[in-house]
């Protein structure tokens, strides 16, 4: 049973996706109740009552829907053989990235694994830049040279192709923040399959030793490639994995719960208490990568059940519509605008100019004098250029 409060009136309504709602100020803001947070070595944790404004609700819904549609477009481009190399989709896990980003301040940093399209979009790249990067276009996020796994943004350090490679990188970024006496946090994202990597334990030891402002975030989607978590981990309570590092479990399919947990964890780090581990319980709809149909180690019925009962976008839409924050007509208009943006981006990904061969020698080093480029066949003196400089030169 859910009670929706509009001004002083109580209107009972029923929805399995919402535990409790209170709405004030003519439905311009609302308070929802999340699933309880599980805690490790913490006396208290985030409040389960989370507040959201209409503006933020629309923003989060639009971002999650955009990522979902963008990933669908990326999958289609791959099937058309327009995407070369690997391609890992984020469909189903949108609330993890959107909720985390919503809790970040301008100076905070993030680093993640190869499932990075959504994070790249949230870090300032347009949908067109992401899709053009996938198809090797000069208008891509990194001029078409990075592909699916290597995209970047302001204070977003990738996109890393090696399992767990971002764990020590995030620790190093947090060390730099503390060294510079900056009140910021580095959020280091990885999957459940990477929690058994030795470098995670090494990183957490150093982070706790020096009380670095780093959040280790495990996006537990249930499968490391094609292996269920219980078949590879002696304990699947990943929020306790840090032992001496405190941890929080959060429903990773609830964008507001994710935002609440990360906000609380950031306050912990900024108070000088050191690192914290967050496990976000989520799910991926696609296979590990586009080469994996995702049906040999789980059933289609399992995937459909999650879509029906736990989908982060549908669940959030039901909440904000029930609360009166948005109308069905507003939802339809958002859907229309997102489709329009995706369609335009797909067209660019097909037609924009491909990255020229001249860019192969750019971005090797920064600001160095002209010299011979090693491992090339032409004995020609080359100036080390950035891709931006090379593109400008080619345009002349």
Curated annotation (Swiss-Prot):
Residues bearing the modification Phosphoserine: 289, 296
Transit peptide: 1-25
GO biological processes: glucose metabolic process; pyruvate decarboxylation to acetyl-CoA; tricarboxylic acid cycle
Domain of life: Eukaryota
Entries under InterPro entries matching the protein: DH_E1 (IPR001017), PDH_E1_Alpha_Subunit (IPR050642), Pyrv_DH_E1_asu_subgrp-y (IPR017597), THDP-binding (IPR029061)
Protein species of origin: Ascaris suum
PANTHER family xref list: PYRUVATE DEHYDROGENASE E1 COMPONENT SUBUNIT ALPHA, PYRUVATE DEHYDROGENASE E1 COMPONENT, ALPHA SUBUNIT BACTERIAL AND ORGANELLAR
Protein name per UniProt: Pyruvate dehydrogenase E1 component subunit alpha type I, mitochondrial
Binding site for Mg(2+): 192, 221, 223
Known cofactor(s): thiamine diphosphate; Mg(2+)
Keyword terms of this UniProt record: Carbohydrate metabolism, Glucose metabolism, Magnesium, Metal-binding, Mitochondrion, Oxidoreductase, Phosphoprotein, Pyruvate, Thiamine pyrophosphate, Transit peptide, Tricarboxylic acid cycle
Subunit text: Heterotetramer of two PDHA1 and two PDHB subunits. The heterotetramer interacts with DLAT, and is part of the multimeric pyruvate dehydrogenase complex that contains multiple copies of pyruvate dehydrogenase (E1), dihydrolipoamide acetyltransferase (DLAT, E2) and lipoamide dehydrogenase (DLD, E3).
